[in-house]
Amino acid sequence: MLPHGLIVSCQALPDEPLHSSFIMSKMALAAYEGGAVGIRANTKEDILAIKETVDLPVIGIVKRDYDYSDVFITATSKEVDELIESQCEVIALDATLQQRPKETLDELVSYIRTHAPNVEIMADIATVEEAKNAARLGFDYIGTTLHGYTSYTQGQLLYQNDFQFLKDVLQSVDAKVIAEGNVITPDMYKRVMDLGVHCSVVGGAITRPKEITKRFVQVMED
């Protein structure tokens, strides 16, 4: 089980300056030394490098685009197999109700339970309906990761209306809830923890210096 506290997302996509398994392992080490209780990471290669560097539980994902589907976070059993090989403690996958490129969500959950019975599963959702569906399927964790990042929730921010969406999710499911997406200040982190989430994933505000720099520059441009 993931501990209560701060999970730091250590990810850099191929078009980003810090794209490197070695660099992500050092990001994870910095997060560990700062007090993080877990890491969220993308790709088998990054996860293996991180697990060689820090003794923390890892939420693993594989981001891969597929034609004719907007699902890109651990979309098929191919990505699941890569994550099983990485020996991450938690496999996270898109648990929205969008059309998937291959297996159904139910099939993927069954696949993970069969092939990796000791691995926990996290649902990345965008709506309360999707949270309820993930709970029905038996996900161990339900994360607000994709709220604001789907075509039907675009423009919505997790912290709007004092985290009302997060409150709605907490009231709708019994599974452990993870706050993720636009938790960008220590005060926001404290607020979501006070609301009763199991843990919170913070990425961009800690491990993406390019995006952090942009926010400083844009303050003056605006």
Swiss-Prot record:
Enzyme class: isomerase
Alphabetized SUPFAM superfamilies for the sequence: Ribulose-phoshate binding barrel (SSF51366)
UniProt xrefs under Pfam families: NanE (PF04131)
Annotated catalysed reactions: an N-acyl-D-glucosamine 6-phosphate = an N-acyl-D-mannosamine 6-phosphate
GO cellular component term of the entry, any: cytosol
The keyword Isomerase appears for this protein: yes
Gene Ontology molecular function, alphabetical: N-acylglucosamine-6-phosphate 2-epimerase activity
Pathway in which this enzyme or protein is active: Amino-sugar metabolism; N-acetylneuraminate degradation; D-fructose 6-phosphate from N-acetylneuraminate: step 3/5
InterPro entries: Aldolase_TIM (IPR013785), NanE (IPR007260), RibuloseP-bd_barrel (IPR011060)
Biological processes, Gene Ontology terms: carbohydrate metabolic process; N-acetylmannosamine catabolic process; N-acetylneuraminate catabolic process
UniProt keyword Iron present: no
EC number: 5.1.3.9
Keywords: Carbohydrate metabolism, Isomerase
PANTHER family documented for this protein: N-ACETYLMANNOSAMINE-6-PHOSPHATE 2-EPIMERASE-RELATED
Protein's job: Converts N-acetylmannosamine-6-phosphate (ManNAc-6-P) to N-acetylglucosamine-6-phosphate (GlcNAc-6-P).
Family: Belongs to the NanE family.
NCBIfam families with a match to the protein in the record: PRK01130.1
Stated name of the protein: Putative N-acetylmannosamine-6-phosphate 2-epimerase
Organism name: Staphylococcus aureus (strain bovine RF122 / ET3-1)
Gene: nanE
